A protein has these predicted regions:
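Catalytic cores of secreted/periplasmic lytic hydrolases that degrade extracellular macromolecules
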Residues: 1-176
């Protein structure tokens, strides 16, 4: 899927987007169609993309990184694992398998903000944080430990290749 990661420099989690919202919408709608449809309507998916771009700019997190990770974690928003669509948990935060659904947020906006703010914490220890939106503590040793997408492996998830897998989703989004 996408461009081989080994041939590319690392991808920063923080910064300006390399893509437009229209490119991201193509990625989201194509991905969900290929998977047999999403748990949400196309309108909700478009609203989700808009929220990632708006909140990503506020949080200084690249929206395509958040959307790529969300596509991986939710199975292109089919929510066939432990996390349900009604939780607005876009990255499986707190879901550790065995039926444990993880964190829930009250709205799409808060779910996107919680996801992107958590990514920001992994990428930078110096940024100010509203810890209430995070709803789950993050060990201090992880704050700023993953400035690049590839560095998420073994931290966000146990797999050492997790970050490389997320990068492949982001590459697919960028090339959509």
């Amino acid at each position: 899927m996408g461009v081989p990661v080994v041939d590319l420099p690392k991808m920063s989690i923080l910064g300006l987007s390399y893509t437009s919202p229209f490119t991201a919408i193509r990625f989201v709608l194509f991905g969900t169609t290929r998977r047999g449809g999403s748990s949400w309507t196309d309108l909700t998916l478009i609203e989700m993309v808009a929220a990632y771009y708006r909140i990503g700019a506020e949080e200084e997190v690249r929206p395509e990184v958040g959307l790529g990770q969300s596509a991986k974690e939710t199975g292109y928003w089919t929510f066939e694992g432990d996390v349900r669509a009604s939780q607005w948990n876009f990255a499986g935060i707190g879901a550790t398998g065995g039926g444990r659904p993880g964190i829930s947020w009250p709205s799409l906006e808060e779910g996107v903000r919680g996801h992107l703010r958590r990514l920001r914490m992994y990428a930078s220890a110096s940024a100010p944080y509203d810890l209430d939106i995070l709803r789950r503590s993050l060990p201090l040793s992880y704050w700023g430990a993953s400035p690049d997408v590839e560095d998420l492996g073994g931290r966000w998830a146990k797999s050492p290749t997790y970050g490389i897998s997320v990068r492949q989703y982001v590459n697919t989004l960028i090339s959509s």
